[in-house]
Amino acid sequence: MKCAVLFLSVIALVHIFVVEAEEEPDSDALVPQERACLARGETCKDDCECCDCDNQCYCPFDWFGGKWHPVGCSCAHANQYFCDHKKEKCKKA
């Protein structure tokens, strides 16, 4: 009798793992969705990627004319002059 209970317990345990494995989605199936714009503090490559008019893509160590950024760039606060410049630069075509 004990053997039958043990056997059924093992069958139930195997069934639980099989069902859980079927319910998990593949990591390849999960596609990251791109945001329309980046919030302040997030990593960026261009001013047009940053949300709002008063945010710019700021690179603290902008060496070699913008071709190499050892620390990286992030969206940061800008002034009103930059806001006007960004409107012209980032017009939607």
Swiss-Prot record:
GO molecular function: toxin activity
Protein location: Secreted
Main location: secreted
Signal peptide, first to last residue: 1-21
Role: Probable neurotoxin.
Family: Belongs to the neurotoxin 09 (Tx3-6) family.
Protein name (Swiss-Prot/TrEMBL): U11-ctenitoxin-Pn1a
